[in-house]
Amino acid sequence: MTIGLIFALAGCSLLMPKEAAADNIDITGTVQSRCIVNTDTAGVYGNPNAYTLTTLPASNGQVPIVRIDVSLANAYNAEISYPTSFSSSPSLSDTVAWTGAVATGQTSVSGMSAYQAASTTTGAKRTYALTLAGTTWFTVASTATYGGGGNKAFPGGSYKAVVLAECIAQ
C-alpha cells in the first residue's frame, strides 16, 4: 500500500500547476538619420573696428554656410542658431551684444525657396520644416559688439563662436 500511495502522490504532483518560467527577450534595431548636417563653409570674424567682430564679407568676414541633406520629406525640422556667446576668447570684463540672422541660401529643389517664409524664430534660433527631400544651404550671419553699447575695444587674441545646427525628428 505504501507503494500505491507513493504512485498516487507522484501522479497528483504532475497535475499540480507549475511555476511559470519567464525571460526577457530583447528586440534591437538601428535607425539611420535621413537628415544630415554638414559644414559647407566655416565662418570667419572680420574686425572692422575695435569693438565689433562680424562675419559680414564687407568687413573681411566670412558668413558660415550649413548644408542640410534630407532624404525623407516631412520627417525633420532644421533648427539653426547664430552664436550668442564665445566658446573661447580672451578674458572679457564687459558685456558682448550679439546679433545675427539665419537665412535659406541655395537649394536643390525650387520649392525649398519657401522655407524662409514658413520658418519660425525664437531668440537666436530659426526653425525650418524640411518638407522636401534634397539639399538646402543656410547662411548664418553673426555680429558681436563689445562694451554693452559703449563701444569698448575687444582685447587682442583669438575668438571663437559656434553655430548650432540640428536635424530634429518631427
Q: What is each PLM-predicted segment?
A:
Residues K18-A97, G123-Q170:
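N-terminal small/polar-rich segments of proteins
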Residues S91-K125:
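Terminal beta-strand-rich extracellular "head" domains
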Residues M1-A8:
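Sec-dependent N-terminal signal peptides
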